[in-house]
Amino acid sequence: MIILGFESSCDETGVAAVCTQRGLLAHALHSQIAMHQEYGGVVPELASRDHIRRIVPLTREVLAQAGLRREDVGAVAYTAGPGLAGALLVGASVAQSLAWSLGLPAIAIHHLEGHLLSPLLADPRPEFPFVALLVSGGHTQLMRVDGVGRYVLLGETLDDAAGEAFDKSAKLMGLGYPGGPALSRLAEQGDASRFDLPRPMLHSGDLDFSFSGLKTAVLTRVKAATREGALDEQARADLAAATQAAIIEVLAAKSICALKQTGLKRLVVAGGVGANSLLRQRLAEVLPRMKATAYFPPLSLCTDNGAMIAFAAAERVKAGLANLEQGDHAFTVRPRWDLAELERG
């Protein structure tokens, strides 16, 4: 079966075609970063309008790339949440309309399940069970994954997500949007040892995270350096390096602890922060000593994208967990949706 997937939960419009037998056939993505830069963050109304402009041309592009006709598609999938309500409605409306017009089933997919399963698109593909570190702008969670639809929450952030810590710290340093990648680039020129920053909950004994205290510590350092007239470019680079080092140390340590507690030897890292080179380097150094392996999605699939949505739908179909009845195509979106609430069937 060929599944056409749509992602529009925030500021990326993604469309992809996935075959349940052959895998990813084609995908296309449009990022709204340039549009939102002048505002310093995502403007929901502008995001929704841009999704409307982009989603149909991207769909045509994917069908052309894969050499498909509309009649070749066997099902349609879309992100139903969590995300921005207006943005979600664009993708859901297009997906449901297309499914209705072609007489196809429409499969609602949890955005985080898309991220969670995206490393299965990599080669080699991790086998179940594994520990998953789901780390993005809005979420930081450790999950035990025993199969498609079989997820157990091990730990999560109690306040800010890791991606938020990157973005908010970058904003405090006067860096542009998106802040996380800008901070990571600047950190390459810095000395992390110049600033001593806290590692919140590093030794808490559980698998939860907290990054709000780190953000406060960065604010304190920025204010102090500004008062002293010492917040020059090198100081900002050093502070960026120290901030990144603190976040990555906590993420890596908690992931290692999760592997030890579960006895598993496979760690899957998913979400936008999974593209961070220091995180990849740190895990690549430490995990082999534990005879464990880290798996990452391809860099092009770390951000939000349609491929992960179409692929998650394909995995659900193969596992017998997707509702393939056409129904009346009435739908809702869920801006807030805990992955633990996800039904298996």
Curated annotation (Swiss-Prot):
GO MF term set: iron ion binding; N(6)-L-threonylcarbamoyladenine synthase activity
Residues the record lists as binding Fe cation: 111, 115, 304
EC number(s) per entry: 2.3.1.234
GO biological process, one term: tRNA threonylcarbamoyladenosine modification
Cited InterPro entries: ATPase_NBD, Gcp-like_dom, KAE1/TsaD, TsaD
Major subcellular location class: cytoplasm
Binding site for substrate: 134-138, 167, 180, 276
Pfam families membership: TsaD
Gene Ontology cellular component terms for the protein in this record: cytoplasm
Cofactor descriptive note: Binds 1 Fe(2+) ion per subunit.
Record keywords: Acyltransferase, Cytoplasm, Iron, Metal-binding, Transferase, tRNA processing
Reactions catalysed according to its record: L-threonylcarbamoyladenylate + adenosine(37) in tRNA = N(6)-L-threonylcarbamoyladenosine(37) in tRNA + AMP + H(+)
Gene3D superfamilies noted in UniProt: 3.30.420.40
UniProt-listed SUPFAM superfamilies: Actin-like ATPase domain
Reported cofactor(s): Fe(2+)
Subcellular location(s) of the protein: Cytoplasm
Function: Required for the formation of a threonylcarbamoyl group on adenosine at position 37 (t(6)A37) in tRNAs that read codons beginning with adenine. Is involved in the transfer of the threonylcarbamoyl moiety of threonylcarbamoyl-AMP (TC-AMP) to the N6 group of A37, together with TsaE and TsaB. TsaD likely plays a direct catalytic role in this reaction.
Family: Belongs to the KAE1 / TsaD family.
Name of the protein in its database record: tRNA N6-adenosine threonylcarbamoyltransferase
Organism: Bordetella avium (strain 197N)
